[in-house]
Amino acid sequence: MHRTFSALIAIAAAALFSGSASAQEVRIARQFSMGYLQFNVMEHEKLLEKHAAALGLKDVKIAWSIFNGPDAMNNALISDSVDIVAGGVPGLVTLWARTKGTANEVKGISALSSQPIFLNTRADHIKSIADLKDSDRVAVPAVKVSLQAILLQMAAAKLHGPANYGKYDALTVSMSPPDATIALLSGSGEVTSVFSVPPFQQQQLEKPGVRTILNSFDVMDGPATFTVAWTSARFRDKNPVLYKALIAALKEATGIVDKDRAKAAGYWIEDVKSKLPLDKVTAVISGPQVRWTMTPEHTMNFAAFMASVGSIKEAPKSWKDMFFPEVHDLNGS
């Protein structure tokens, strides 16, 4: 009887350890754009599987998926349909604020990249956003809620005062980056300006007459995180060893992107089935203002602004409030 009871205890303990230290499948989601190269590298070179195995977690399976926007992706995370997601900083800020102090609390894993976003125009009369007329239309991925729409609000607040942050909202229209690029380059139609993402913003600038009137780094007062990865405290707490492997995989992937941009560009082309030539993609991800880094940069600017306009209830006291401790030793902001 005593041996039977001891055996049951051992089995229960083993099951408890297994549930807290590993996961048979990790579901990772990202969005379209060139902001997630670490994930492309991790998928192709099986880095998470490698680091998990080195820590004793064998046969970990990774399921990769792509979402069209942050809302659906965040809903999938909250409903436990995915484990790890990546997108723009406002998506993280929104979900962090919504889940703070709850059982479903969400925080950032790390930044992925700092890249400038360009507001490009084809209209001769537009030299800056101050020249936008009621007849102009600015294409953004999603009005009012996308990274680009929020950047335009921040720029308006800087130029016209905080109370007028929504001055240009009525001029914005929702349009995917590919469709917005076609609309801009056609030279006709109501869209005169586009706030987009790489590589579309670079493609737009290849056409004579198209020029940049706003750089997001100017709005953010310096280099700013473009893409970031986040997850739930539930997933991190349940899988501490796997989470350690994830951080190691992200570090290795970031190093690979830094050292071999052409390799990373090739992975991205393959994953999105892009027809862009390798040298052009490599040039975009190697731009003078592009940095592949896990360090969050100027994320507090987004949070403070979103709190000031009521998008979230209150801003975090520090960027560290929005990120798990594994990156707290970085010189973030």
Residue ranges of each PLM-predicted region?
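Bacterial N-terminal signal peptides that target proteins for export
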Residues: 1-9
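Cleavable N-terminal signal peptides
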Residues: 10-11, 21
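Sec/Tat signal peptide C-region and signal peptidase I cleavage site
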Residues: 17-23
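Short, glycine-/small- and polar/acidic-enriched structural segments
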Residues: 25-165, 170-174, 188, 192-198, ...
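Small-molecule pocket liners
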Residues: 37, 113-119, 210-211, 225-229, ...
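Pocket-lining segment of extracytoplasmic ligand-binding domains
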Residues: 161, 167-169, 178-270
